[in-house]
Amino acid sequence: MTTPYYSDDAVTLHHGDFREVLPSLGLDVDLLIADPPYGETSLTWDRWPDGWPSIAAQHARSMWCFGSMRMFLNRRDEFADWRFSQEVVWEKHNGSGLHADRFKRVHEFASFWYRGPWSEIHHVTPTTNDATARTVRRKAKPVHHQGARGPAHYISEDGGPRLMRSVIY
């Protein structure tokens, strides 16, 4: 078992190679948050840790993983133990650009992965309390790609809840 790098009543942080630290803890978790090296540059610190998604699957039921589209596509076979659910885009204020011939990267993807039945995964509808007050009236719609919908009417309040956007600042 490793010695925690930091610990208080709410959180315990361990520092080290994930592939060694997680198995040594001897526990299973509901959610894992990972931000691995993407393995996209020749920099010495940017080396993909082979096998880590499979180790994570042995100890976690769900996972948020930060990365780039290239990282996920290049390593898609390593995520075979996981089911992909959704992704959000984290828009960064200051982007990074190590290549002059590409767009300056001002975002990263955070993708949600899970194992087992979706009904057994803890998920809460993500909302934010910054809705603009308005009244919406929707007419009944014919069957299209979302199915038939009846008429709807609702009023939102200033500062009330709304679904969170998939692009997060």
PLM regions and their residue ranges:
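Core catalytic lobe of class I
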Residues: 2-169
